[in-house]
């Protein structure tokens, strides 16, 4: 299996399976001299780890990260642990696997999962928790994202769940401070209260639901990205689409832009500070022609309902026999919830990569 690496200068390779011994990543291309402690990475992992509320999988993984390489500290660094510029290897052990929960689907394909496609491509698959196709892999991405944040000075990256099923938030009540005060990473406290009742009902029915996640990067300098095949928004779309269960991505107004007239969609400008233009709107989501314009970079993506549910579903075995499946094990009733910190991590990794690429191809060396 290839294609486990993404990025050009800031490169991330992830490894591991849901029920393997461990998972992790190797970050290559991180500049030297950046302070990096395990506690900083751990803080991001703690936001994603399972078992923190009744609304996520009850698999309880501490997700303790170990930095295996790429950092150094002594009296010359003032005791601070700094990156050395060499590959940074990060490892997270799996401690709460229950592989027996999956023995009944060893030879059957779960509808909505990658079971069949992995089998038909590779001729072998790790059926325990989905193996490499499990969302457990995203823990490694979150760890890499914590490193990436060190590379992009002055950039603030935040994400939120803005819709669950058909129920969107009221954007007039958007409050970033509310995101950390409810189990859904929801910026609308009133809607978050509704989500509790809504998701409890779905859990009782043994079902699941999808979600929409919005991630915003503020402080992104103008000039990141390149025309045609190096577009910032193209790389962001690819990064978000690579997250498990994501089925659609939009930048800025996205598909809503198709409903607007040209005069409504145009991000008009007036003279701003320092000779740079001041944008009067941000329909483009901070990217024009594949290059950042200094406005907030805004990305949204749709996450499908968790395919592992208690409702009987029709399927077939590897031998072609028809079966009815009920998926056992511990699963997220809304996998979109824990996709929020993953979205931030992928935004950070893409921006870090483009930031380093930009430094090598800039007018005046800026």
UniProtKB/Swiss-Prot annotation:
FMN binds at residues 132-134, 244-245, 289, 304-308, 330. It catalyses: 5-O-(1-carboxyvinyl)-3-phosphoshikimate = chorismate + phosphate. One of its GO terms (molecular function) is chorismate synthase activity. NADP(+) binds at residues 48, 54. GO terms for biological process: amino acid biosynthetic process; aromatic amino acid family biosynthetic process; chorismate biosynthetic process. Pathway: Metabolic intermediate biosynthesis; chorismate biosynthesis; chorismate from D-erythrose 4-phosphate and phosphoenolpyruvate: step 7/7. InterPro entries: Chorismate_synth, Chorismate_synth_AroC_sf, Chorismate_synthase_CS. Its EC number is 4.2.3.5. Pfam families: Chorismate_synt (PF01264). Its cofactor is FMNH2. It comes from the Bacteria. Keywords: Amino-acid biosynthesis, Aromatic amino acid biosynthesis, FAD, Flavoprotein, FMN, Lyase, NADP. The keyword NADP applies. This reaction introduces a second double bond into the aromatic ring system. NCBIfam families: aroC (TIGR00033), PRK05382.1 (NF003793). Belongs to the chorismate synthase family. Homotetramer. This is Chorismate synthase. It comes from Methylobacterium radiotolerans (strain ATCC 27329 / DSM 1819 / JCM 2831 / NBRC 15690 / NCIMB 10815 / 0-1).
């Amino acid at each position: 299996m290839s294609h486990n690496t993404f990025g050009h200068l800031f490169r991330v390779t992830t490894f591991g399976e849901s029920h393997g011994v461990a998972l992790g990543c190797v970050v290559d291309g991180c500049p030297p001299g950046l302070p990096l402690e395990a506690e900083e990475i751990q803080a991001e992992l703690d936001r994603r780890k399972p078992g923190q509320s009744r609304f996520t999988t009850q698999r309880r993984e501490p997700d303790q990260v170990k930095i295996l390489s790429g950092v150094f500290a002594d009296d010359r660094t003032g005791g601070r642990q700094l990156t050395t510029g060499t590959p940074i290897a990060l490892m997270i052990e799996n401690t709460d696997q229950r592989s027996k929960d999956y023995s009944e689907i060893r030879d059957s394909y779960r509808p909505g999962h990658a079971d069949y496609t992995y089998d038909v491509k590779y001729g072998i698959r790790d059926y325990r928790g989905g193996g490499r196709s499990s969302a457990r892999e995203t823990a490694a991405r979150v760890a890499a994202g914590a490193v990436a944040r060190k590379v992009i000075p002055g950039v603030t990256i935040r994400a939120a769940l803005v819709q669950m099923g058909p129920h969107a938030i009221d954007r007039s009540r958007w409050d970033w401070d509310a995101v950390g005060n409810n189990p859904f990473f929801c910026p609308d406290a009133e809607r978050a209260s509704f989500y509790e009742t809504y998701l409890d009902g779905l859990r009782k029915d043994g079902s699941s639901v999808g979600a929409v996640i919005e991630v915003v990067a503020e402080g992104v300098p103008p000039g990141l990205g390149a025309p045609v095949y190096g577009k910032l928004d193209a790389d962001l779309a690819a990064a978000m689409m690579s997250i498990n269960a994501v089925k659609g991505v939009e930048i800025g107004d996205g598909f809503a832009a198709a409903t607007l007239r040209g005069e409504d969609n145009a991000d008009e400008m007036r003279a701003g500070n320092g000779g740079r233009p001041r944008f009067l709107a941000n329909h483009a989501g901070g990217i024009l022609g594949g290059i950042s314009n200094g406005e907030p970079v805004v990305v949204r993506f749709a996450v499908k309902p968790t395919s592992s549910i208690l409702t009987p579903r029709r399927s077939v075995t590897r031998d072609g026999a028809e079966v009815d499946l009920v998926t056992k094990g511990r699963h997220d009733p809304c996998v979109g919830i824990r996709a929020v910190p993953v979205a931030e991590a992928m935004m950070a990794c893409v921006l870090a990569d483009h930031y380093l690429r930009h430094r090598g191809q800039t007018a005046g060396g800026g």
